Design a protein with these regions (language model features):
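H-loop/switch region of ABC-family ATPase nucleotide-binding domains
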Residues: 127-128
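Conserved ABC ATPase signature
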Residues: 42, 67-71, 75
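A short, surface-exposed alpha-helical micro-motif characterized by mixed small hydrophobic
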Residues: 133-135
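Conserved ABC ATPase "signature" region
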Residues: 30, 45-63, 88
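Catalytic Walker B motif of ABC-type/P-loop ATPase nucleotide-binding domains
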Residues: 92-96
């Protein structure tokens, strides 16, 4: 696949979500539409609608005109998630989506990701919070030092033996 085709196929939310750009949150989310836009042209109505849907999905519409440099870490994380959602790709890769969030927003983000998956998007989440993984994930892939230890449902994976082996907790 070409880089452009990959960009339309897989959306990515990195764990590191800092920016020094002093631009409105909505503009940052619009960057997610880059693979769908024509160079040097104004965003289409479809792009604007995709950005609206993404901002609404993460409850970020109210601060979408603020500079991303003025947002709290939790607000910023939601805006970056909106950027990934705005791609409207068939696959979404997400690295630690709930980092720096209070419990309410952690649950809200996980519900968003669950709904995205229910809509038919393939969602792969890297997550170290076992409680959130057990509550929201249908399937888990348990890894230790880059190697797959086990895979299956949360009930199958989150066993005392696996937790002892991978996390040294009992």
């Amino acid at each position: 696949l070409s880089a452009e085709a990959r960009a339309r196929t897989v959306a990515y939310l990195p764990q590191s979500r800092q920016t020094e750009w002093q631009l409105p949150a909505r503009t940052l989310v619009m960057l997610g539409r880059f693979p769908h836009r024509q160079m040097f042209k104004a965003p289409s109505a479809a792009c604007e609608a995709a950005v609206d849907r993404a901002l609404s999905a993460v409850n970020a519409t109210e601060f979408s005109k603020r500079s991303v440099t003025t947002l709290s870490q939790g607000e910023s994380a939601r805006v970056f998630l909106a950027r990934a959602l705005a791609v409207e790709a068939p696959f979404l890769l997400v690295d630690e989506p709930t980092a720096d969030m209070d419990p309410y927003h952690q649950i809200h983000v996980m519900e968003i990701l669950k709904n995205v998956a229910k809509s038919g998007v393939g969602v792969l989440v890297v997550l170290h919070d076992l409680t959130l993984a057990a509550r929201f994930m249908d399937k888990l892939l348990l890894m230790k030092q880059g190697q797959i230890v086990d895979s299956g449902t949360p009930k199958e994976i989150l066993t005392a033996g696996n937790l002892e082996h991978v996390y040294r907790i009992s």
